[in-house]
Amino acid sequence: MATAKPKKKNPRLASGRKRVRQDTKLNAANTSLRSKYRTAVKNVEKAVAAGDKDKAKDLFAKAQSIVDIVADKGIFHKNKAARDKSRLSAKVKALALAPAKAA
């Protein structure tokens, strides 16, 4: 059984109330970007798994942009973003170099 968290008290100071409002907005924006990042990476990996070279290249180009945006905003560390881009790039390049499958 899940236990409900005790409700937090509202801040008394105006600056504290403003901080709560700002944090809520930032949390929503960060969650949205994080989701977009994961979706972009997942789409590239699906295209690679399907063996679709052109689609994988196009999706990888879009994913790179999203990964850079997320790293610049500090949602994910820049080294994690670089590592993910590198791994995706290696998968796309391996797909491009692989001989075409007989259909």
From Swiss-Prot:
| Gene Ontology CC annotations of this record | cytosol; small ribosomal subunit
Which named protein is this? Small ribosomal subunit protein bS20
Q: What are the disulphide bonds in this sequence?
A: none
Q: Where is the composition biased (Basic residues)?
A: 1-20
Alphabetized UniProt keyword annotations = Ribonucleoprotein, Ribosomal protein, RNA-binding, rRNA-binding
Q: What does this protein do?
A: Binds directly to 16S ribosomal RNA.
* Region Disordered, annotated ranges: 1-31
- A GO term, aspect molecular function: small ribosomal subunit rRNA binding
Say if the entry is tagged with keyword Disulfide bond.
no
Q: What species does this protein belong to?
A: Polaromonas sp. (strain JS666 / ATCC BAA-500)
Q: Which family does it belong to?
A: Belongs to the bacterial ribosomal protein bS20 family.
Q: Could you give a single Gene Ontology term from the biological process aspect? A: translation
* SUPFAM superfamilies in the record: Ribosomal protein S20
Q: Which InterPro entries match?
A: Ribosomal_bS20, Ribosomal_bS20_sf
Q: Where are the transmembrane segments?
A: none
| One Pfam family per UniProt | Ribosomal_S20p
